[in-house]
Amino acid sequence: MALILYAIFYLFLVLLNFFHSFKQESNKLELSQWKKGERGKC
């Protein structure tokens, strides 16, 4: 039982890590697009 809980916890950590890095990448893309848009306005 404890092993199953440990496995679920480990999977959760991996998913959280993956989601966090994915979110950072999308944020970088959004920031670069926003900067380009700002330059276009000025």
Curated annotation (Swiss-Prot):
Keywords: Chloroplast, Plastid. It is found in: Plastid, Chloroplast. GO terms for cellular component: chloroplast. Pfam families: Ycf70. The keyword Plastid applies. Belongs to the ycf70 family. This is Uncharacterized protein ycf70. It comes from Triticum aestivum (Wheat).
